[in-house]
Amino acid sequence: MVGSKDIDLFNLRENEQIVSPCLIVHGKCNKQNGAKTVQVQHPQLPPITYPIHNQFFKATVILTPGENKLTFVTDTNTARTIVCYYTPLTQNPPVHLCLILAKDSPLQFDSPREQKDREGGNGLELAIKKLRLGARLMQAYTNEQMLRNSMGNRTFPFVEEFTWDTLFERPAMRNTIKIHVVRSEKTVKEIQDPDIAQQNSKGKNTGALFGIAMDALKSYGGPFTNNEKPVQAACMFLDTHWDGKLIRGHAALGGGDDSIKLAIFGSHGLYSWPTCLEQLVPYFTDETRSSTSEVANDCNECGTYWECLTITLGAFMHEIGHLLGCPHQESGVMLRGYTTLNRSFLTKEAYSVRTNSTGASPPIFPKEECTWNRLDTVRFLYHPSFTLPQDYYDPSFMRPTKLGGYPNIKHSVYPLGNGSCRILSPTGIYLIEIICDDLARGHIEYLPVSLGGQGPQREVIVTLDDLRARLPKNELAKFGNTFKLKILSVNAPETEFDKFPSLLDVQPLDMSKYGFSKNVQGIKSPLYGRSDGGNAVGVVAFDVRLVTAVRIYHGYALDGVRFYYKEKPTGTKDAPASKPSVPPRNYFSKITHSIKNHASINEENLKSVLFGHETQNFTDATLEPGEIIIGFNLRCGAWVDAIQIITSHGRMTDMFGNKDGGGFAELQPPNGQYILGVTGRVGQWVDAFGIIYGAL
């Protein structure tokens, strides 16, 4: 907080480095002299005036690259000057903001006659102005939320260009948000087809607008084709229309694929959005009743102009949240908490038809505002669009570099007995969510050291008791034995484990029936591949310390594996097992000591066990004296595509089979334990594969 005798600023410090082009500055006038307004003055920008209530104010401020000298002056001549520095992070992946037009679009959006008279129409240029300012408000709001969650000043960038900036009443040439005007191949009639309107309960294809937007972007070309990384795009359909019963040409959707991450929305509420910053407070407090003969009352929550602005701006931001990787949450923007988005910019709320009240009392404290859920902000922290330069000075951060197209890495879960398990991630786990009825009700986060955490973890031990203790009592009663676990890692797709408690409810296997000592017990790992495919094989046991060679049967998938081992001399006792050595876990680095393939196995005096099928196509791998198998890497999906053997000497074989098939998974017993055998399911080839592990 920057303090002075007369004015305090709560969320802006002297000489602070800012990465958002727009801020919501919270302040208080300590001098009780009846100040009603505060004006923000900037040497390069027009002044903007904001109201003061109960001595508090919220001022939405635009910044220019470099030094920004901001002076806050009340109408009673109380003043405070502060300097901050804005640095656009052009290296971060931006969001492209787009208006999608039908090929025969009249270039107009829905607007009541009164509003058209006030704003001078409802054409394309006005839509661009409104969308540009709305995007700046989303950036400012998100930056404030990240700051409140102790993650620093961070927000996502939009694509910008040097052109006429319309954020103020008087346009000027400077950097501002670029609005792509994208023509669709579809006509107005096709876009407004009731069958593809999302809110039409009888519609036959209510998700079609998402595909129409995707096709329009790809036809537009430029940044939306032939890119190395997925492109992020937030699109509004200009030709959305309220016909008195249905909003046509509108869908609120967010998601995408590895080429385009996409959010779409309709323009049915755009009439209520401000066109410039000077209109921000008047538009957020405009109690004019919506005329449903002219414009839509979306979800019956847009009874006034200001409520329409709040709902539609917030709902579009909700879809951008999906674009940025956020699922629905139990609270906040990703639930439907954006019905109070207006409060983040105001110190006094207007009358709400939706609630039949004047809402929060002045000056509207942060606890009464809409929020990004904590889990959203953690996702943003590990999203490439939110990167800060100083993140790279913290080795524990493991900064993400990809928006999609990840290597298909599967997390490994190893039950340990007693309701506990070990979770492995090759890239580092930063968040574990406990999912009850599709919503996260508890979580464990691994923030970087610079933000007070321990950094993403490649190995985590969790217990059912700890996970259940993180659930609210009502959720625990309903879902304590059935909750899902969702694991998020850096540069990797999310992984969900259904009915997670049952996964840990394992019964140790008595391994004495397989030739081990009486006290040896084994635990089955989860199966990778198709866990309901083929036929169950049971346990194929072997003493890994006696294995000298492996024969892998493979073609375009894994057919089988035969383990050759020395027979233990009669009458000898098991030697005490020493702790197996653990090689480095960087399986993506270049392999310099690979096991020799196609070696001839001398089968004399060797026994063997077979998992799967024996075929004419195989590769042999021979172990060195004292070398044991400590794990396997797999490529798997609907079956097991390929297998790689890892040894205690830090060596790995090639990936035998279809090395480009499926996703990557690893199987290794917990530290101090050994592989006691393998298990899985086999059909025409190996459908699923797992290990048995335990102490020796």
UniProtKB/Swiss-Prot annotation:
Provide an example Pfam family for this protein: Metallopep
Q: Which residues carry this modification: Phosphoserine?
A: S361
- Which residues does UniProt mark as catalytic? E319
Q: Does the keyword Phosphoprotein apply?
A: yes
User: Which cofactor does the UniProt annotation name?
Assistant: Zn(2+)
Q: Does the keyword Ribosomal protein apply?
A: no
Location within or outside the cell: Cytoplasm
Query: Which cysteines are cross-linked by disulfides?
Result: none
Q: Which GO terms describe its cellular component?
A: cytoplasm
GO BP = proteolysis
* Listed InterPro entries: Jacalin-like_lectin_dom, Jacalin-like_lectin_dom_sf, Jacalin-like_metallopeptidase, Metalloproteinase_M10B, Unchr_Zn-peptidase-like
Q: What is its EC number?
A: 3.4.24.-
Similarity annotation? Belongs to the peptidase M10B family.
| More details | Present with 195 molecules/cell in log phase SD medium.
Entry-linked PANTHER family: MIP04191P, ZINC METALLOPROTEINASE-RELATED
The protein here is known as Putative zinc metalloproteinase YIL108W
